[in-house]
From Swiss-Prot:
Organism: Ralstonia nicotianae (strain ATCC BAA-1114 / GMI1000) (Ralstonia solanacearum)
Catalytic activity, reaction form: tRNA(Lys) + L-lysine + ATP = L-lysyl-tRNA(Lys) + AMP + diphosphate
Residues that coordinate or bind Mg(2+) 1: E420, E427
First-tier enzyme category under EC: ligase
Oligomer and partners: Homodimer.
Subcellular location: Cytoplasm
Protein name in UniProt: Lysine--tRNA ligase
HAMAP family: Lys_tRNA_synth_class2
The keyword rRNA processing is annotated on this UniProt entry: no
Entry-linked PANTHER family: LYSINE--TRNA LIGASE, CHLOROPLASTIC_MITOCHONDRIAL, LYSYL-TRNA SYNTHETASE
UniProt entry keywords in alphabetical sequence: Aminoacyl-tRNA synthetase, ATP-binding, Cytoplasm, Ligase, Magnesium, Metal-binding, Nucleotide-binding, Protein biosynthesis
Source species taxonomy: Bacteria, Pseudomonadati, Pseudomonadota, Betaproteobacteria, Burkholderiales
Gene: lysS
Length: 510
């Protein structure tokens, strides 16, 4: 018996899609006349991948003796008709398996109908497992049905969707034809499941906080604005859940976390999407040092659970998450990757402003209204060192003026107990010991309002209710946010954040 490895004759390549669709609609019309266009009474008992796993070592004599009866359904991806016998490769949600279809077993009428079925059709079969002469596990079909007619032709099997934007716009087609895309989103699910599992093991409670905020807060970002008709008030899609999660710490839940969407009305890039997924978690009686240790272990374990290893390959370069993550201050990172800068220069605000002009940074912009040396150092770090942080690196000791929610250092004036984690030159996580002094927090909010009044659209609003919550007393707390999309990019070797978001936003089709 011969096995197929090629699709049906490429008639679709010589015809435009409209003609193909017209022909398929005629076939659908005939099915409607027969009253069997879209049946819904077939229940699969098995999945392809499970069968391949379970019977991977079972030879044909053993399969014949076992008489393994199966019922499977899926999309027909390959088809080869050879007289009285045919082969079809069917793809279900787990993988692919081959059907062996003969006229004698399924009957002349069904076999004749099968010849006119198209690639992309959803089909179902009952039969028994066997191995072909070449050793491929297959289903010897005894009953065959068409469950759903595909009206649009699939892309060429060898090239898939060549247009990258079309992959994003028609993700459903991309998922049909690309096993790599399917594996990416399976890995995403595994990574998130890993995070949830380990958060639960550590005593964290998963919660849900509002997506509509009366005051945007928790991050420096430009919000999306909407209107609540029933309350007749302006609302904002949340830019971060932070202030609500810390209200829960005040309320007595000592360890909380949330995995959900944030929205920031800002630019789109290979690492930025206006709608993205974050995990934020807060633990009472911890600080930023504890957070760094915990975050490191969390990410390492997510890699193992999602990919099977902490040793990754990202865009052609090796990356080993099993090694201890590096820890550097902002100035240490600058001097590591731009050693021409001296300690004295990095402490000189005038020098830093002049240096930043070389990078075309406008230090007279509103966001630099209250910029001290620390802020200028941070911007220089972003220009000289950030993109070079390939190995996992915690950058610590952020200036207070860019960390309005972080606790100040007890030993370093103007510095906060804050870190950001960078891997492959991208920020993956941001965390800090939380500011729980209501008077200090109120003053920092006031300074943020000054920056906003001066034109800084990303400066924070004054949140009086959050101050009121802090006035009841919040225990010492550490909090961290992990970018799920960027983490999945790392774990799946994806160069663009849109590769790991099922339906990223795109411009309207013309």
């Amino acid at each position: 018996m011969t096995e197929p490895n090629t699709p049906a004759a490429p008639t679709g390549q010589a015809q435009d899609d409209n003609q193909i669709m017209a022909e398929r609609r005629e076939k659908l019309a005939a099915l409607r006349q027969q009253g069997v266009a879209y049946p819904n009474d077939f229940c699969p008992t098995h999945h392809a991948a499970d069968l391949h796993t379970r019977y991977s070592e079972t030879d044909q004599p053993a399969l014949e003796a076992a008489n393994v009866e199966v019922a499977l359904a899926g999309r027909m991806m390959l088809k080869r008709v050879m007289g009285k016998a045919s082969f079809a490769t069917v793809q279900d949600g787990s993988g692919q398996i081959q059907f062996y279809i003969t006229r004698d077993r399924v009957g002349e009428d069904v076999y004749a109908a099968f010849k006119h079925w198209d690639l992309g059709d959803i089909v179902a079969a009952r039969g028994v497992l066997f191995r072909t002469n070449k050793g491929e596990l297959s289903v010897q079909v005894q009953e065959l049905r068409l469950l759903s007619k595909s009206l649009r032709p699939l892309p060429d099997k060898f090239h898939g969707l060549a247009d990258q934007e079309m992959k994003y716009r028609q993700r459903y087609v991309d998922l049909i034809v690309s096993p790599e895309t399917r594996n990416t989103f399976r890995a995403r699910t595994k990574a998130i499941a890993s995070l949830r599992h380990h958060m639960s093991d550590a005593g964290f409670m998963e919660v849900e906080t509002p997506m509509l905020h009366p005051i945007p807060g928790g991050a420096a970002a430009k919000p999306f604005i909407t209107h609540h008709n029933a309350l007749d008030m302006q609302m904002f899609l949340r830019i971060a859940p932070e202030l609500y999660l810390k209200r829960l710490i005040v309320g007595g839940f000592e360890r909380v976390y949330e995995i959900n969407r944030n929205f920031r009305n800002e630019g789109v890039s290979p690492r930025h999407n206006p709608e993205f997924t974050m995990m934020e978690f807060y633990a009472a009686y911890t600080d930023y040092r504890w957070l760094m240790d915990y975050t490191e272990n969390l990410i390492r374990q997510a890699a193992i659970d999602a990919t099977g290893s902490a040793a990754l390959n990202y865009q052609g370069r090796e990356l080993d998450l099993s090694k201890p993550f590096h820890r550097l201050t902002i100035c240490q990172a600058i001097q590591k990757y731009a050693p021409q800068y001296t300690d004295a220069q990095l402490a000189d605000a005038n020098f830093l402003r002049a240096e930043l002009k070389k990078f075309k940074i406008d230090t007279n912009a509103p966001q630099f209204l209250n910029a001290g040396v620390g802020t200028l150092q941070l911007v220089l770090f972003e220009e000289t060192a950030e993109s070079q942080l390939w190995e996992p690196t915690f950058i610590v000791d952020y200036p207070v003026e860019v960390s309005p929610l972080a606790r100040g250092s007890d030993t370093l004036p103007g510095i906060t107990e804050r870190f950001e984690l960078f891997i492959t030159g991208r920020e993956i996580a941001n965390g800090f010991s939380e500011l729980n002094d209501p008077e200090d927090q109120a003053e920092r909010f006031r300074k943020q309002v000054e920056q906003k009044d001066a034109g800084d659209e990303e400066a924070m609003f004054y949140d009086a209710d959050y101050i009121r919550a802090l006035e009841y007393g919040m225990p010492p707390t550490g909090g961290c946010g992990i970018g799920i999309d960027r983490l999945v990019m790392l774990l799946t070797d994806s160069p663009n954040i849109r590769d790991v978001i099922l339906f990223p936003h795109l411009r309207r089709e013309d």
